[in-house]
């Protein structure tokens, strides 16, 4: 029996798809990329209108390319659109965000009854769904979900409605899970969650968790998928200062560079607070890569607000940014606000920020030409290998030896945007090494 999983959206979904894959394997399925499988799972996203469109398109693709499959739709889109999806009788099983581990139970039930199953828990107060992995298929960087849900209710965001309230994985389970992954050869682990920095288990907060994780023997890199600026407290700064296991990259959502818009968004900081904390981070790690998310065209965003955001992004010197045009989401306060921004104006502002993004990326990448950086190599094509540095630069090298899954020291020779091109220091000719090590 074969199964295929289509995954959309965030790193949390990537982790949860791996858990589903494990469950399928344990029950006799070969998880494959080949279509026309016996079981087909679509793990959906609904964070933006575009995510909704991609989810619908992927569901239709999955149905068409897997005509004999038991089709299962799970995740954030099915959590809020389960009634709409239930009208499509080609979808056999519909699960939400809090019961993805019920796939096997539901497959067996469907085989018996041949009746569509809709199992979506609409209560916001959930318990943390038990999930644990000891490998990550076809990857050399493993994601570990430590937390689910969000209590912030930013006025633009549907996620508190799809993921429910904050709940967290047991402290000991997180440590055991990462220890198992490291024993199985993973050198880098990425902590992920819906609101990762809100982690709390008994008396252990997020910084306590980091303190224990960095002690795990054999773990070379610990990456945080995303963290709010308000959670970067003195305890976190102390860990950043003391541990070289924490990578030189941190993703801190900004959302807007206008204090007026931040207030309308119900964000918990202003630009001054944000800037001051960034300065503290750079005092500890001068070359750290700081990336962010911004939303363009939030209701009420006028030209001055956009210019303020543009200037603030330029001033902070992000090494990269994700740019999203604002889209109305059901249940959110922003969807009901006056002064919705014209779509053409949004598109023009997005274009301007994408140009700024490219300039910022090039500026940051160029700082490392001639420098030696450690790279975890993840993919290969013949003698060409691609991986990422601690500060999340994408690097390409050529090598005759197999370096996939290994961390190698590389000298960066040039930029072929958006990739850095370098050479393994171990393969540099002797006469050149003296220059490199000066």
Q: What feature does the model see in each segment?
A:
Residues 137-140, 150-152, 246, 256, ...:
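Short flexible coil/turn linkers enriched for glycine and charged/polar residues
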Residues 71-72, 80-81, 85, 183-303, ...:
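Conserved SAM/AdoMet-binding glycine-rich loop
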Residues 41, 76, 103, 191, ...:
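Residue-level signal for inorganic ion chemistry
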Residues 148, 159-164, 229, 267, ...:
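Short, conserved catalytic or interaction motifs in soluble domains
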Residues 1-192, 197, 202, 235, ...:
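Proteins enriched for Cys/Gly/acidic motifs involved in redox and nucleic-acid/cofactor modification
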Residues 248, 329-335, 422:
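Conserved loop-to-beta-strand segment in the C-terminal subdomain of adenylate-forming
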Residues 336-438:
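Terminal RNA-binding accessory module
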Residues 46-47, 163-164, 263-269, 336-341:
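Short glycine-enriched, charge-decorated loop/helix-capping segments at active-site entrances
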């Amino acid at each position: 029996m074969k199964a295929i999983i289509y995954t959309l959206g965030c790193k949390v979904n990537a982790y949860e798809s791996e858990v589903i894959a494990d469950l399928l394997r344990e029950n006799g399925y070969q998880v494959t990329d080949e279509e026309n499988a016996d079981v087909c799972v679509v793990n959906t996203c609904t964070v933006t209108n575009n995510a909704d469109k991609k989810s619908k398109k992927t569901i239709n693709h999955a149905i068409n390319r897997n005509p004999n499959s038991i089709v299962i739709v799970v995740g954030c889109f099915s959590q809020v659109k389960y009634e709409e999806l239930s009208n499509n009788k080609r979808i056999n099983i519909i699960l939400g965000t809090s019961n993805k581990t019920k796939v096997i139970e539901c497959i067996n039930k469907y085989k018996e009854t041949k009746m569509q199953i809709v199992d979506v828990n609409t209560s916001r107060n959930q318990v943390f769904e038990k999930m644990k992995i000891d490998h990550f298929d076809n990857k050399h960087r493993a994601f570990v979900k430590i937390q689910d849900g969000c209590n912030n209710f930013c006025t633009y965001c549907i996620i508190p409605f799809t993921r429910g309230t904050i709940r967290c994985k047991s402290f000991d389970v997180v440590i055991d899970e990462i220890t198992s992954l490291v024993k199985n050869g993973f050198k880098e682990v990425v902590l992920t969650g819906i609101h990762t920095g809100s982690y709390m288990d008994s008396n252990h907060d997020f910084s306590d968790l980091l303190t224990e994780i960095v002690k795990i023997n054999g773990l070379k890199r610990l990456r945080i998928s995303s963290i709010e600026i308000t959670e970067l407290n003195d305890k976190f700064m102390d860990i950043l200062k003391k541990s070289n296991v924490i990578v030189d990259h941190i993703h801190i959502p900004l959302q807007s560079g206008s204090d007026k818009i931040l207030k309308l968004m119900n964000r918990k900081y202003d630009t001054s607070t944000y800037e001051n904390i960034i300065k503290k981070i750079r005092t500890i790690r001068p070359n750290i890569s700081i990336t962010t998310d911004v939303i363009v065209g939030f209701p009420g965003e006028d030209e001055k607000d956009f210019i303020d955001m543009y200037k603030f992004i330029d001033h902070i010197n992000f090494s990269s940014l994700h740019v999203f045009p604002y889209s109305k989401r059901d249940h959110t306060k922003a969807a009901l606000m006056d002064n919705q921004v014209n779509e053409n104006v949004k598109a023009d502002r997005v274009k301007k920020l994408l140009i700024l993004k490219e300039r910022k990326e090039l500026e940051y990448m160029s700082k490392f030409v001639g420098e030696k950086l450690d790279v975890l190599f993840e993919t290969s094509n013949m003698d060409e290998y691609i991986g990422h540095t601690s500060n999340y630069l994408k690097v390409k090298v050529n090598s005759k030896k197999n370096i996939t899954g290994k961390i190698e020291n590389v000298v960066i020779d040039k930029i072929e945007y958006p990739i850095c091109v370098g050479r393994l220091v171990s393969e540099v000719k002797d006469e050149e090494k003296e220059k490199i090590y000066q």
